[in-house]
Amino acid sequence: MAGARGIYGLSGSGIDVESLVKVGMMSEQKKYDRIYKKEVETEWRKEAFADVYSEVNAFRSNMSDMRLSSKTKPMTATSSLSDAVTATANANAGVMSHTVEVTQAASNAYLMTTSGQKVARTNTAAPTSVALKDVAFAGGTMPAGMTSTDTALSFKLSNGTGTTEIKFTAEEVFTKNLTLNDLATRINNARFIGSDGKKSALNITASYDTVSDAFSIVNTQSGTNNKVSLSMDTGASSATYTTALLNNLKLGQVSGGTISAPLSFTISGTTAKLEAAGTNASVKVDGRTYTNLQDNKLQVNGVTYTFKKATPVGTPAQVTIAQDQEKLVENVKKFVEDYNKLLDDLHGRYNNNKYPDYGVLTKEQEAGMSREQVDKWNERAKAGLLYRNDYVRSIISDMRDAVTNRVGSAPGRYNNLASIGITSKDQSGHLKLDETKLRNAIAAEPDAVKQIFSHTDEDDNYSDNGVATRLSERLGKRMESLKSHAGMTADKSDRSELGKLIQEYEKQMSDFKKLMSSFENQLYKKYNAMEEAISRLSTQFGFFSRQ
């Protein structure tokens, strides 16, 4: 017989060595399997806790949102002239109408090839070329005396705060044939060094439109302080060609939906400059004038206005602020749904008992089953992993406590969930919503939901905190405990208690495997010696039988 540790049975002893070794190893294999089953079950339990952590975390995130006034007191803002002014309102805004006059909206510094014109070319032989050499240089050729390393084009670009240089060498212009698109790219990538020594974006963008043969440069920020300024040293060797380039772009200033004639360079000493600035907004809200607004936004008493253009003279916009009751009811409904969903899941895990006849399968047992059979078995074997678990029980208890108790900081009769139509409908703590009662409460006290849900006490007094605040803070603490015990994921290397336990079981299995291998070798040696002894006896018996 061929064995795993040698060849046996040649003596004719009839001993089944393999079977004897296997029987001898059975008790050791059972010991190993007990550790293996503990390790697998701990992995499953860790995975179950990871699911709980994820679900609680998602709900807690929703509770953090529910603390926001935009959730507990959403407001609407409607403008009678939405093409001129729009608005949004937060919970601090009063339910009322506002009169808004826009004298002038803020605008950006904006240069563009003048309407009805196209980019001109100094090289008249190439009237549609986009190459810089044809736009700025006669004949599209390098001037005499200029070398490839010389600066062919150069100007300063400023946004009113920072300045940088845009330049091209003769090699880039005449050998690499850079184009108007490359000019736009170089402007878009421009940076300047600020007073802090760090590079900052100019917030100036440029583009070339091949269809209309037009070039544009715009400062992305509005207001008079934000400019587009192009300047150069008139004494520089590249000044003549740079002037030709910028003049040929035919840049006019865009303002109020119209575009001016091409701007000209103004000369001051040795500097030539072409510049456009944005405009500030000037508005009047409820009779109060606001001037020199750098952008088109203004917040007054919880209302944020956005200005688009001037309102007609004598016809101001009416901006009406109202509470968004439908949105508020929708938010409360979602809270109830989210709460019940999490509570149902936790109750399911807490009350789900084990199947006593289903445990972790050994590798040998799995080998004798189909994949489908193993999956079905494991589905039942995983039941009850968190049955009557203290961590789950604590979360359920905190959730129910948070929604049941009165909010001490809420004035008047609307001071708990029941007062606005949210009550427990059964022993499980499942919530139900009386929508009519909720709407009546909102109508009677617009701040009712906000007071009950989102209040955060300065002294962190639990009884004075709102429901969403209580849930967020209590669940946060429970999540820290879960994290310490089981981690946030199924990863065993997270240094959680269960993660460390899994690693300890794995070490025990590894060490026990070595002991089993040693014990198995001892068994083979034992039966090998037995075979040899029987062989010697057989030889002696044969000798005496022949006498």
Q: Whereabouts are the PLM-identified features?
A:
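Active-site neighborhoods of enzymes that stabilize oxyanions during catalysis
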Residues: 69-85
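Short, structural beta-strand-to-alpha-helix junction motif
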Residues: 127-143, 147, 151, 173-185, ...
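Short, contiguous acidic and Ser/Thr-rich linear segments
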Residues: 164-179, 329
